[in-house]
């Protein structure tokens, strides 16, 4: 079940722990995807805290929010780019998106297959998707004081297997939020140091799993002109069907 948009907004924008989490996840996303001019960047779930750095250079930015969650205007002080949508019917053309971030949209969905099918549909050739979910092995999935304590936590193997079943190829995976989900001043002050330590020690499990995936594009199963030309040209007919007609009339020039 999706969380309410007001609860998500209050956590990420009105608590110190939420701002720490937002910064850690967004910084890691920027390492994977530096802003690039001309890209269409979209987010599904409650991914808008990750999208602000792309507003300046992207061709367009879209924040898709599922109906059960609700929607809020975003970004503040600018033209709204957030849209309310159904999980299985995103209001985007097929192949439009270059970069797609999914946060609080998969683990809380009652139909994750529909979410992944739509993610695959809207992603264009060469596009990348980033799935941000609670890490089954981390502390954040075990406390309901944060949004990552709700829904289904994933292991890396579970998430990658689910992505492959829906036509994605996992490219990179990592964890973030290595400090515990605590409002204690010590942990909040040292959160950045824990993130740096986590990047140096891959075995140190963070509270949130991030998996980057590309869209698989399959070659057509049929080849040759028959696959694309319903009625072959007449010049190709008769090849291999016996002797060809003579190129010249044998009586030509005798009249």
From Swiss-Prot:
It comes from Fuscovulum blasticum. Pfam families: Methyltransf_11 (PF08241). GO terms for molecular function: S-adenosylmethionine-dependent methyltransferase activity. InterPro entries: Methyltransf_11 (IPR013216), SAM-dependent_MTases_sf (IPR029063). This is ATP synthase subunits region ORF 4.
């Amino acid at each position: 079940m999706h969380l309410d948009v007001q609860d998500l907004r209050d956590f990420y924008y009105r608590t110190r722990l939420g701002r720490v989490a937002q910064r850690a996840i967004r910084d890691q996303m920027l390492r994977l995807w530096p802003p690039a001019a001309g890209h269409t960047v979209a987010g599904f779930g409650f991914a808008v805290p990750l999208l602000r750095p792309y507003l300046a250079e992207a061709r367009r930015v879209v924040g898709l929010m599922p109906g059960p969650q609700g929607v809020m205007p975003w970004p503040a002080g600018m033209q709204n780019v957030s849209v309310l949508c159904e999980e299985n019917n995103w209001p985007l053309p097929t192949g439009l998106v270059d970069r797609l971030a999914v946060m609080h949209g998969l683990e809380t969905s009652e139909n994750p297959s529909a979410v992944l099918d739509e993610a695959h549909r809207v992603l264009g050739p060469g596009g990348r998707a980033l799935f941000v979910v609670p890490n089954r092995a981390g502390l954040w999935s075990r406390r309901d004081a944060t949004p990552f304590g709700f829904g289904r936590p994933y292991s890396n193997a579970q998430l990658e297997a689910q992505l492959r079943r829906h036509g994605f190829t996992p490219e990179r995976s990592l964890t973030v939020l290595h400090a515990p989900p605590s409002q204690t001043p010590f942990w909040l002050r040292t959160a950045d140091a824990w993130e740096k330590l986590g990047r140096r020690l891959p075995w140190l499990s963070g509270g949130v799993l991030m998996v980057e995936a590309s869209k698989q594009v399959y070659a057509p199963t049929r080849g040759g002109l028959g696959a694309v030309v319903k009625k072959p040209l007449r010049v190709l007919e008769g090849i291999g069907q016996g002797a060809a007609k003579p190129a010249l009339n044998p009586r030509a020039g005798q009249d």
